[in-house]
Design a protein with these regions (language model features):
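Canonical Rossmann dinucleotide-binding motif of NAD(H)/NADP(H)-dependent dehydrogenases/reductases
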Residues: 2-35
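Short C-terminal tail/terminal secondary-structure segment
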Residues: 4, 146, 209, 227, ...
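Substrate-binding pocket helix/loop in short-chain dehydrogenase/reductase
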Residues: 97-98, 102-110, 203, 207
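Active-site helix of classical SDR
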Residues: 121, 157, 165
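Alpha-helical segment proximal to the catalytic Tyr-Lys
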Residues: 126, 170-174, 235
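Residue(s) in the substrate-gating loop at a strand-loop-helix junction
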Residues: 141
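A glycine/serine/threonine-rich, flexible loop-to-helix segment
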Residues: 174, 186-210
């Protein structure tokens, strides 16, 4: 039988990478129990020490695979009976010009940046609609909010993911389900640094100069920014997209 608890239940699709660990900490500090995709065992212990009940679901964080988000949702409902909030980030960063691009590159980007949020939304939306409440946040990219020289395919597909999210929000707003998107760029995390070469201090400085705030974003502050879209304190915003890129958009 599912556990019954007055605490809110949050689902984090990938709790191991990108902002997933910081989002998990944010939820724990705000009194949530958690269903997490592929969390590090040390993170689970930390969250439990903060008072959260943690359900760790293995081998589901790659949400480009259509079955993985559904596995996480099914596990969360089996354990807790429901969930109140769900968040996912995905992506496949392949820079380069349009002229030099290939259909193989486009297919990889679509798989990581459009199919992934599609599968996630298909899994999390129906149970939230059925229960008549819930909050969903899809993390896309600020590159989808403006033309991005050097990343034309990536920018275009990210724009599609953002608009998919906003369209879903319009469909389910009357069911008291909020669905929003936030797009990042210039964030300090390994995949960005590797894809752009910004592990090199000189290259990093070049990127920082493109950001009006003249630095890269931190994951802890980004998790705090995401909180009102997910923690139940603000439930009258849906269908919105916000960039989180230090003023670049």
């Amino acid at each position: 039988m599912p556990e019954t608890t007055p605490r809110r239940i949050a689902l984090v699709a990938d709790a191991r990478h990108y902002v997933g660990p910081e989002l998990s900490r944010m939820f724990a500090r705000r009194g949530h129990d958690l269903a997490l995709g592929d969390p590090d065992p040390e993170l689970v212990a930390e969250l439990e020490a903060l008072g959260s009940t943690v359900l760790a679901v293995e081998k589901v964080s790659n949400i480009a695979k259509p079955e993985n988000s559904q596995k996480l949702v099914d596990a969360a409902i089996a354990r807790f009976g429901h969930f109140d909030a769900a968040v996912a980030a995905s992506g496949q960063i392949i820079p380069g010009s349009f002229i030099d691009s290939s259909i193989d590159q486009l297919e990889k980007i679509v798989d990581g940046c459009l199919y992934a949020p599609y599968h996630f939304l298909k899994a999390v939306i129906p149970p939230l609609v059925a229960q008549g409440s819930g909050q969903v946040l899809v993390i896309t990219s600020a590159a989808g909010a403006r033309p991005t020289p050097g990343a034309s395919l990536y920018s275009s597909v990210r724009a599609g993911a953002t608009m998919l999210t906003r369209n879903v929000a319009g469909e389910v707003a009357r069911k008291n389900v909020q669905v929003n998107a936030v797009g990042t760029n210039f964030m300090d995390f390994p995949e960005f640094l590797e894809a752009t070469g910004a592990n090199d201090p000189a290259v990093r400085e070049m990127f920082e100069k493109q950001v009006p705030m003249r630095r890269l974003g931190r994951m802890d502050e980004f998790a705090s920014f995401c909180a009102p879209f997910l923690d139940g304190t603000s439930t009258f915003t849906t269908g919105q997209y916000v960039s989180y890129a230090g003023g670049w958009v």
